[in-house]
């Protein structure tokens, strides 16, 4: 009986993950600004992880710039900047690795205090790189005020969301008329050296 309940619980969590990825994909294909897409993804992450804070930083040359956040940090969007090697977020960008700290994240030697963001009020920290075309283009952070043991599912979800955000950024770089006018079959076939028939 206990095994059946455990399997049922795991199945429910997988269904929740699938619904999350579906909702994120729907944001990505809508005719919305990139800021609206990122804010929508942040809202979904907060709902799914029950975190207290979700932040998306994107690269601007050698800096990471806060570009999306749940309501606690809206005034800081576009204003908070850090170097690619600064703080926990910068470490994730530089190392291209997920980082999970379950408690006292502010005591980690990589932690950097930013006056604009009260990040030292959060105990737990989970962060994943945002990757587009195999390059780090940003970082997505999830923070909890209380200690929180991040499980493998949460880490996997945040990693996948980092990849989805990277895809959204890559797609956003294409002009809308390009998406409509491009011969998609020719584009794909030419990438593997096949010429489409005339």
Where are these regions (language model features)?
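GAF sensory/regulatory domain recognition
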Residues: 43, 53-80, 84, 104-107
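A short, aliphatic-rich beta-strand micro-motif
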Residues: 123-131
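Acidic/proline- and glycine-rich, intrinsically disordered low-complexity segments
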Residues: 75-99
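Signal-transducing coupling segments at domain and membrane junctions
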Residues: 74-75, 102-124, 144
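Amphipathic alpha-helical coiled-coil segments that mediate homodimerization
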Residues: 20-28, 33-52, 56, 88, ...
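Signal-transmission linkers at sensory-effector interfaces
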Residues: 1-30, 35, 137, 171-197
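Short beta-strand-to-loop transition segments that serve as allosteric relay/switch motifs
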Residues: 72, 139-148
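Allosteric cytosolic regulatory segments
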Residues: 159-166
């Amino acid at each position: 009986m206990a095994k059946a309940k455990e399997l049922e619980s795991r199945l429910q969590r997988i269904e929740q993950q699938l619904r999350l990825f579906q909702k994120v994909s729907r944001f990505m294909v809508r005719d919305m600004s990139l800021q609206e897409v990122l804010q929508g993804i942040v809202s979904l992450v907060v709902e799914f992880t029950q975190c207290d804070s979700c932040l998306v930083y994107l690269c601007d040359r050698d800096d990471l710039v806060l570009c999306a956040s749940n309501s606690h940090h809206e005034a800081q969007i576009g204003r908070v900047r850090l170097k690619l090697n600064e703080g926990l977020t910068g470490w994730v960008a530089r190392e291209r690795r997920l980082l999970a700290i379950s408690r006292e994240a502010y005591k980690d030697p990589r932690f950097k205090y930013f006056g604009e963001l009260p990040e030292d009020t959060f105990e737990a920290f989970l962060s994943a790189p945002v990757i587009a075309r195999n390059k780090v283009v940003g970082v997505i952070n999830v923070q909890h005020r209380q200690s929180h043991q991040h499980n493998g599912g949460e880490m996997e979800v945040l990693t996948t969301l980092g990849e989805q955000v990277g895809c959204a950024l890559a797609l956003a770089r294409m002009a809308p008329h390009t998406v409509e006018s491009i011969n998609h079959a020719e584009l794909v076939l030419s990438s593997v050296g096949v010429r489409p028939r005339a």
